[in-house]
From Swiss-Prot:
The gene is lepA. GO terms for biological process: positive regulation of translation. One of its GO terms (molecular function) is GTPase activity. This is Elongation factor 4. It is an enzyme of class 3 (hydrolase). It comes from the Bacteria. It comes from Legionella pneumophila subsp. pneumophila (strain Philadelphia 1 / ATCC 33152 / DSM 7513). It is a peripheral membrane protein. PROSITE patterns: G_TR_1 (PS00301), G_TR_2 (PS51722). GTP binds at residues 26-31, 143-146. Required for accurate and efficient protein synthesis under certain stress conditions. May act as a fidelity factor of the translation reaction, by catalyzing a one-codon backward translocation of tRNAs on improperly translocated ribosomes. Back-translocation proceeds from a post-translocation (POST) complex to a pre-translocation (PRE) complex, thus giving elongation factor G a second chance to translocate the tRNAs correctly. Binds to ribosomes in a GTP-dependent manner. It is found in: Cell inner membrane. One of its GO terms (cellular component) is plasma membrane. Its EC number is 3.6.5.n1.
Length: 610
């Protein structure tokens, strides 16, 4: 009786609902998903764990959703009919917005979950607009209604004023206790439109996500738009033209459940023994080899990395394992960009592109945990546009690739438009923070207790620790959403860090001339604390070109060579001290200083002292 005879073989598309949940971090999205799975009997009581869909350890520890997941559930509504609900989970953090747009492309509707105590947040707003742009039906839901500080009336007016959705009929629920969750499922069946599609048309399936399984090869999560795909069919990947035989199709309930076929309107997985990692790229279209579709489905926008950093294995023996790990991760995470890079200080590694600082942390943590690698990362940097004296335009994502100063005519830095939603009480500190970060105010709109402030801020100022500072000055109430706006001319310089008069290429940074002196001083001070003491003095210098702007010294450890002299002539002591001094000088010429990982990260964490 699997899925009630597959809902009469899914001939009735009117009984399928594909939806996502849109919510800010901590507004209860994963808990609501758990309740849906419980009510629809997807898992038994014993198999339930909190945040079922957050399958990675990192997701549970940090309490955030990183990867889009999918579950197919059977729900018997009050009208007596059984509906198939395909729920695609989405992340809430600003760094993972591309995951959200991918999930929404496979849906007809979305549930907007807003915390009844905290109200609307900037990232929720951004995702909600994406859903509305894609013509999805959005159902507002107020969560955490049982909290003593819940203010449903205020939040309803916020949803109407800020987002512009009619929220008078917003369903009030408590995902934790299960109160009102059935009403959400009923509203979902009643209001979200069924998928359009023709089971008899040639197959068109959109790849929403792919990941690598060491036994099965590439597993693709697909939304069937038209047609059907069965086990044993020969399918073709439309962008590459390669054909593969389908070994297995099925759905997640949330356990992987094999089926004979997937039909139009459904969301499920396909395994076709694809062993090469780029065999089924995300956003591509699958069709059948014998009866192919004419045109490719519109995919997703390719996301451009915003932040670049070098990642290097601590042991050079791990380089090949690191290359394989990156290839497998990039299949699962389409926004991860990487290319080989070598550094004099760190050896061979990769230059990787990320969507933001959280994305970078998560990728490094996943590489270290899932593939047992020890990695060193260099300070993150954004992409700068350089115009040379010859009139050429270059894009530079690595400070060590910057041409010599005489060859540079103009330098441009990327500017982002940041939309910050903040309660009125914290407006002052937020404006101060934005001005500190060289921000220019674009607009300010009051709605209820909240203020929406829009600033144009250099991206290099946003990607370091702007998000953390924003949260701390507003006690966690402010929320941020940003996107790239333009390149703008700026007075930028390359600052080198010298250790014992040797330039360390991996520590170079591009900074604004006005803040170069204070930044150089902070980096030198921080490095002084982090570099262990040696048998000789270690000089740490920050330099712009040949001009030294800051210096700190890590004092040498020294042995008391005069301890064995008891009395006697002072020249005896002096002779021993001179001998020690000469030895130290010789050691300094050949000595090699080990730089710990924390020192590399210090280059961009200097702001945290402010």
């Amino acid at each position: 009786m699997l899925f009630a005879r597959r809902l009469e073989q899914l001939k009735d598309l009117n009984r399928i609902r594909n939806f996502s949940i849109i919510a800010h971090i901590d507004h209860g999205k994963s808990t609501l998903a758990d309740r849906f799975i419980q009510i629809c009997g997807g898992l038994t009581e014993r198999e339930m764990s909190s945040q079922v869909l957050d399958s990675m350890d990192i997701e549970r520890e940090r309490g955030i959703t990183i990867k889009a997941q999918c579950v197919s559930l059977n729900y018997t509504a009050k009208d007596g009919k059984t509906y198939l609900l395909n729920f695609i989970d989405t992340p809430g953090h600003v760094d993972f917005s591309y995951e959200v747009s991918r999930s929404l492309a496979a849906c007809e509707g979305a549930i907007l979950v807003v915390d009844a105590a905290q109200g609307v947040e900037a990232q929720t707003l951004a995702v909600c607009y994406t859903a509305i742009d894609q013509s999805l039906t959005v159902l507002p839901v107020l969560n955490k209604i049982d909290l003593p500080q819940a203010e449903p009336e205020r939040v309803i007016s916020e949803i109407e004023d800020i987002i512009g959705l009619d929220a008078q009929d917003a369903i009030r629920v408590s995902a934790k206790s299960g109160l009102g969750v059935n009403d959400v499922l009923e509203a979902l069946v009643a209001n979200i439109p069924p998928p359009k599609g023709d089971v008899h048309a040639p197959l068109q399936a959109l790849i929403i996500d792919s990941w690598f399984d060491s036994y099965l090869g590439v597993v693709s999560l697909v939304r069937i738009v038209n047609g059907a795909i069965r086990k044993g069919d020969k399918m073709r990947v439309m962008s590459t033209g390669r054909a593969y035989e389908v070994d297995q199709v099925g759905i997640f309930t949330p356990k992987r459940t094999k089926l004979d076929a997937l039909y139009a309107g459904e969301v499920g997985y396909v395994v076709a023994g694809i062993k090469e990692i780029q065999g089924a790229p995300v956003g591509d279209t699958l069709t059948l080899d014998r009866n192919p579709a004419d045109k490719v489905l519109p995919g997703f926008q390719r996301v451009k990395p915003q932040v670049y950093a070098g990642l290097f294995p601590v042991s050079s023996d791990d380089f090949e394992a690191f290359r394989e790990a990156l290839a497998k991760l990039s299949l699962n995470d389409a926004s991860l960009f990487y290319e080989p890079e070598s550094s004099e200080a760190l050896g061979f590694g990769f230059r990787c592109g990320f969507l933001g600082m959280l994305h970078m942390e998560i990728i490094q943590e996943r590489l270290e945990r899932e593939y047992n690698l020890d990695l060193i990362s260099t300070a993150p940097t954004v992409v700068y546009q350089i115009v040379t004296q010859k009139g050429e335009t270059l894009l530079i994502d690595n400070p060590s690739h910057l041409p010599p100063t005489p060859q540079i005519k103009e330098m441009y830095e990327p500017i982002v438009r940041a939309n910050i939603l903040v309660p009125q009480d914290y407006l002052g500190p937020i404006i101060t923070l934005c001005v500190e970060r060289r921000g220019v105010q674009v607009s300010m709109t009051y709605s209820g207790r909240h203020v929406s402030v829009v600033y144009d801020i250099p991206m290099s100022e946003v990607v370091s620790d702007f998000f953390d500072r924003l949260k701390s000055v507003s006690r966690g109430y402010a929320s941020l959403d940003y996107n790239f706006q333009r390149f703008q001319i700026a007075d930028l310089v390359k600052m080198d860090i010298l250790i014992n008069s040797e330039r360390v290429d991996a520590l170079a940074v591009i900074v604004h001339r006005d803040s170069a002196h204070s930044r150089g001083k902070l980096i030198a001070e921080k490095m002084q604390q982090l570099i262990p003491r040696q048998m000789f003095d270690v000089a740490i210098q920050a330099a712009i070109g040949s001009h030294i702007i800051a210096r700190q010294t890590v004092k040498a450890l020294r042995k008391n060579v005069t301890a064995k002299c008891y009395g006697g002539d002072v020249t005896r002591k002096r002779k021993l001290l001179e001998k020690q001094k000469a030895g130290k000088k010789r050691m300094k010429q050949v000595g090699h200083v080990e730089i710990p990982q924390e020192a590399f990260m210090a280059v961009f964490q200097t702001d945290k002292k402010k």
